[in-house]
Amino acid sequence: MSEVNIDAGLFYKRLSIFQKQLTANNIPQALIIVGARSDDNTYKKSTVLQNWLLGYEFIHTAIYITDKKCIFITSEGKSKHLKHLTNQKPDLVELWIRTKDVEHNKQLFIKLLETMTKLDSKYGKILKDKYDGKFIDEWNQILNDDNNNNNNNTTNDHALSAVDLAVTVSQALAVKDSEEFNNTKIASNASVVMMDTFVNDMMIIVDDEKKITNSQLTDQIEDKIENNKWYLKTKLGKNLLQSIKDFDPEYLEYCYSPIIQSGGDYDLKPSAVSTDKPLIGEGVILSSIGLRYKSYCSNIARTFLIDPTSEMETNYDFLLQLQKYIVDNLLKDGVPANKVYQDTIDYIKKERPDLVNHFTKNCGWLLGMEFRDSTFILNAKTTDRKLTTGQIISLTIGFNNLSNDKNDKNDKNDNKTNHQKNKQTYALLLTDTIKITDDSSILLTNYSKDRAAISFSFNDDNETQKENNNNNNKRPGLSQTSNTTALKLESTENTAILKSKLRHENTNADDANSEKLRQEIQIKLHEKRLQEGLARFSKADATDADDFKPIFKKYESYVRESQIPNSVNDLKIHIDYKNQTIILPISGRPVPFHINSYKSGSQNEEGDFTYLRLNFNSPGAGGNVTKKQELPYEDSPDNSFLRSITIRSRDRQRMVDVYKAIQDLKKDSVKREQEKKQMADVITQANLIELKGSRVKKLNNVFIRPTPDTKKIGGVLQIHENGLRYQSQPQSQSNFKNDQRVDVLFSNIKHLFFQPCKDELIVLIHCHLKNPIMIGKRKTFDVQFYREASDMAFDETGGRKRKYRYGDEDELQQEQEERRRKALLDKEFKGFAELIADSSHGMVDLDIPFRELGFQGVPFRSSVLCVPTRDCLVQLIDPPYLVVTLEEIEIAHLERVQFGLKNFDLVFVFKDFNKPVVHINTIPVELLEDVKSWLTDVDIPISEGQMNLNWVQIMKTVLADPYQFFIDGGWAFLTGQGESDEEEESDEESDFRVSDEDPQDEDEESDDYASEEESDDYSGSDDDGSGGGGDDDDDDSESGEDWDALERKAAKADRNSGFD
């Protein structure tokens, strides 16, 4: 357990939830004892509760919990991982450490027993959980001895009686917070990808008529998870799992061994296992798969129909209809568990009474860290539990022991083979993982289940006949509206007579139809975002501003008095640069003040004296407590604070030098803190596994941005086993300083781009990273390898070739040569980029910008061409770069869209609301419709308004209570009139009040430090790279001029060129 890291904040939060549940159920105390690990049952509630509270399983450990106390009894080795829980809240958490001394351990249990009997005679425990081991034996011995003593006494007032804690644990773990839901969502995605993998393998086996048993196919599916890259082999896996930034396949494991059934023997219980009988490729194949991620379970099951009969199809269609009825009408907040089952039975009796006796004994169960919560089953017996918003349910329904006799009699071929006999009995099963919300439920295992998607026909004659039957059946099933629309379309396409007299009227009609279609798509996209928001968040994600507590810095000038420099004996002001300390003479003694305690200062002269005033940080000293800034002191009634001190001296120059030294020391301290924060997310990559000799693929004569050194030096880009290496070529053999290396691992590449040199001056390969790396002294999310596309041209006026050319033949030849050279460069770089993608074994996909879809905009300081790709919106030519991942976008908002303006702004809001929004300003209004069409095509919801919005305040409001934000309609407010920046600024200015409590000079320079130390949370580029490189590459680009200056230059250039 060397890498155990327990989240203290999460522990206190979940402990509080469990304590409230104990109080609600009138259980005064609870004892959870875990002995030796057992592989027979991994879902014991005692172990599940440990995982929920601590994130890990602690064997040979007891946890005693009351409404005010939590006591751990464990070994010394495990106590090291729990010690920080007692340090932060010693009144709440206690740690009793066991040793090798048997008597000491016995006294701990006796002390625990006395504590329990003193509080109450009743205590809660998980009655079903049975553990073995020395730890359990010692506790049972103490408990039995106490019971024997109580039985011998005439009064038995102190005898402990145990009540079952299973329901209490289930209630505490039922509602999932956002982190738990994210883990469940990843687990659901993994189950969907594994089901898709099974379908591909199953189809190959059935089509090729391979001989394999159900259990053998189960083992094949189960073994796939051993390879951490298994999900990269399918497109669905790349979309659902690879796109998740923090996904780690190491945390994936099976909830149960996959269940595959075929050939007429079916068991719809969750305890079923795959049999050793052959996989029969006719009739029905059932597959159930459940994966869990970080211990959070998911479940999915599908029925696959192979050459089905009409009765099979009819019964399966009803199963789909039944699931839709349950999801739409029964899986809602507040519905009792038994009502879900009873209403389902009533619906079957009404619609298909012949199937009632074949229906499963329940409709599913509560899902979480425990795969199947036995206290919350959706059946007729569970009368005391209700569905609640935030719960995750495994909805499992099906029909078993169905007979297929009637359709077999109608078959043309009366000779029944063995396979046809197996088709006599079949079963249907459908399982999905669903989240309960206030309104409609959220489907987490979104995998195809329509009959057309799960039906397979390997008989050509039957397939042809069935297609004809389907076509005949579909025509009468069309609604009147569909028929009318079809007739209208046919009439429009087959006639040459125009309905309007003018061409532009037809164009306007087409535009109107396109706009209407786009609006319909947008309505669906907005509804989808709303449902996703309700699924992602719960009431537990709300944060109260009153709960904010400042973060206090830990610093120390000197541990011992002897460390103070000897030079302070002259009782002057000294600056200790090494320990970042100001030493002031007070009452004849040197008193150290760390530079972090210094706030601001001022220097002025009055008569013959020079006054130096130093202001120090202290709680409530005119600071803005709403800002999450780090404060150097902790406010406590036991602490005394020096707010300011004034020192007078006749030596003016000495005071000037001291004041300057203090200011410089403070600036250096602020700069170090800022650099430390910027480098907080920089990772140390794993080692590059190098290839040797001819196996190394190389691209010579390339340059890198950002450059490791100040000089621009060419180098070679190499492909190795697990990443790329750029190595610069030294200008001379003795100059080893210029031999710079930059390694980029495939696992850290989020996007790989190749941009050709058409209409550009460079051809490039660009790597956008998941986590930043250091190149030289810079932190960067973007690494680019490029080569200039055009060489310097020379005018050969006096050359011998000149006399053979006439007119502009030399210029034409140069242009042809340049086009040829660019084509060769594009081919070389594209081929190498494809090699990179192939060498990554599916970890990286190559993406190429679509220049024809590009639009001009200002993402940072200058106008550039922003170009869409398959997965992103990029600008890769001029730093700072822009890389916006489309999959991460929550909504796109168009600002300043109003009549009379020549341009508009585009704002991207990310699904991770902690990321700053990305602005692309000054887009020409002529491209408005093109931008809207592109955003709609990539499934991004759009909103628009006439004003610029204050996104800092909007995102703070959303983060305060995201669940309530989506309950209130989510992003629907963006379609209305937003407040302008000027209105927001006027509101902020109106809140200003002059304070007379503190002197004027106190905040003058602290504001200067604050401007360096603090930056607006939403005013910069995206720190994780979704918004581009940001300020990492500022040194590579010149600051842009304002628009007035550019217009004056353009007008001057027009006059000089002779244009009016």
Curated annotation (Swiss-Prot):
Transcription keyword on record: yes
Statement: the UniProt record of this protein carries the keyword Cell wall biogenesis/degradation: no
One Pfam family named in its UniProt record: SPT16
Entry-linked SUPFAM superfamilies: Creatinase/aminopeptidase
An example molecular function term from Gene Ontology annotations: histone binding
Coiled coil: 508-532
Biased composition annotated in UniProt, kind: Polar residues: 478-490
InterPro entries assigned: Creatin/AminoP/Spt16_N (IPR029149), Creatinase/aminopeptidase-like (IPR036005), FACT-SPT16_Nlobe (IPR029148), Fact-SPT16_PH (IPR056595), FACT_SPT16_M (IPR013953), Pept_M24 (IPR000994), PH-like_dom_sf (IPR011993), RTT106/SPT16-like_middle_dom (IPR013719)
Entry keyword set: Chromosome, Coiled coil, DNA damage, DNA repair, DNA replication, Nucleus, Transcription, Transcription regulation
Membrane-spanning parts: none
Region of interest: Disordered: 458-490, 977-1060
Annotated Gene Ontology cellular component terms: FACT complex; transcription elongation factor complex
Any one of the GO BP annotations: DNA repair
Basic and acidic residues composition bias: residue spans: 1045-1060
Acidic residues bias spans: 979-990, 997-1044
Subcellular localization(s) per the UniProt record: Nucleus; Chromosome
The protein's role, per its UniProt record: Component of the FACT complex, a general chromatin factor that acts to reorganize nucleosomes. The FACT complex is involved in multiple processes that require DNA as a template such as mRNA elongation, DNA replication and DNA repair. During transcription elongation the FACT complex acts as a histone chaperone that both destabilizes and restores nucleosomal structure.
PANTHER family: CDC68 RELATED (PTHR13980), FACT COMPLEX SUBUNIT SPT16 (PTHR13980:SF15)
Oligomeric and partner information: Forms a stable heterodimer with POB3. The SPT16-POB3 dimer weakly associates with multiple molecules of NHP6 to form the FACT complex.
The family this protein is said to belong to: Belongs to the peptidase M24 family. SPT16 subfamily.
Listed name of the protein: FACT complex subunit SPT16
Source organism per UniProt: Candida albicans (strain SC5314 / ATCC MYA-2876)
